[in-house]
Structure formats: structure tokens, C-alpha cells
Amino acid sequence: MSKRFYWKKLRPIIISVVTCCAFFFILMAITSNRNGDLTIYVDRTSVTKSLSLSESSTLSNPKGKIYGPSLSEAWDTRMCEEEEDPSTVSCVPTDTYLLDGNNSGKHYISYTFYVFNSGIENLDYSMSLNIENTSKNLDDAIRINLYVNNALTTYAKKSNVTGEAELGTTAFESRDVIVSNTVTDVEPNEAIKYTIVVWVDGYDNECTNDKIGGSITLSMKFSVLGIV
């Protein structure tokens, strides 16, 4: 029997799960904030070395913190296969990274933004995508597509059965860190494009009834390096 779960937003803070027959009613909220379910922020800058964030490729309306979309309700889902139409099939489109800003659907979060050097000197920065909090191992069934300048990596927690990365994914870096890296020698006004796509993968063996009542909170942080 194929499994199918229904997700519904209950509060704008956590993923909260209850059950009704074979359904999950869940809030898909990725960070605790009042503006949306996804928060991206810069936590370290200086007068001459500074990062800013923008939803637009024109780098308009720069900010130190931006809020992504809220997901009100969704089924657990999967990535679309070739030639599948997400308007008629419950799946995550493969081309949302081509558009700026919020391109989320009913079943997934998709958000594109730009990190750019808003200072007057070249700089290096670190990026980390983190699990702030999770309960009932809901992170076992989460999938995250991270596009950096349109280059895709799919992240998932290691299989609890094999201890290896799930097929077609890169394993989370640690219990609390999905991925972290450093970008070097970014010139003034140079921008790096990021797209984050998040969904609960219904075809993951870990997407089971014991996740009912679970929650997860994520954050994404950018820090300028070399600031004294």
C-alpha cells in the first residue's frame, strides 16, 4: 500500500503534526518568525567589508535579513519526473530556481535570493544551513535542494538502516548542520545566487507514522570572515 500524508499549517512557528486515519496535518515552518517560514540573515559585517541580501537579481532593496515564504498546507511529495506537469501531478518542479523570490507551491517551499558584497573591499564569507531544533526525527524525511548559482546539490539525512547517504543525495554534514562552506575573494557588488527548496519526501522509508507530532526548525547564516 502506498503511503500518503496530508500537511496543513496550524501555527507560524514549527512543524506540528496530528493524525486522522492515514493523514498527517502538519505545519511546514522552518524558522520561528512572524514574517515567513524561512529566515536568511547576515550576522557579521564591517564598514569596508559587508554582505547584503536581496530577492532580486538587480540587488534592489538590500537587507541584512530576509524572510522567505510560509507554507500553509501540503502533501508529502517528491521531485517531478521528466515531462511531468506539477499543475496536474503532485510533485516539486525542477525549474523553480530560474525565478527570483518566492516560487513555492502547495507542497513545497522554494525561495531564491542573492548574497552580494555591499562593501568596498574584496571579502570571504562562510555559509551554514543549520537544523536549530527537531523532534521525533522529522528531519529523517526532509529533502533540501540547494542551488548555488544554479548548481544543484540535494541534501538528506543518512539512512537509519544503512548509515549511508540516501540515493541521489549528499548526507547532512552533522546532526545540526546540513551544509557549510566558505566563498572566497568576492568583489564589491559581486552576487551569488541561492535557491532553497524544501519538502517532505513521501518516498523516503523514514516518512512513517512515528513522525506524527514532530517538528523541525532551520536557519541559514552568512558571516563575513577576517573581521577583527
Model-derived regions, located:
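Extracellular adhesion/glycan-binding regions together with long Ser/Thr-
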Residues: K3-K9, I13-V17, D85-L98, L152-A191
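Short, polar/proline-rich extracytoplasmic segments that appear immediately after membrane translocation
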Residues: M1-S90, N102, I216, L225-V228
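C-terminal, structured domain-capping segment
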Residues: P93-L123, N130-I131, D176-V228
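Surface-exposed interaction patch
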Residues: R4-Y6, P12, C21-L53, T96-G163
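Glutamate identity and glutamate-enriched acidic tracts
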Residues: D43, E55, E73, E81-E84, ...
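Feature targets compositionally biased, intrinsically disordered low-complexity regions
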Residues: K63, Y67, S118, T162, ...
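Generic detector of ordered, mature protein regions
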Residues: D43, L51-L53, G64-I66, L71-E73, ...
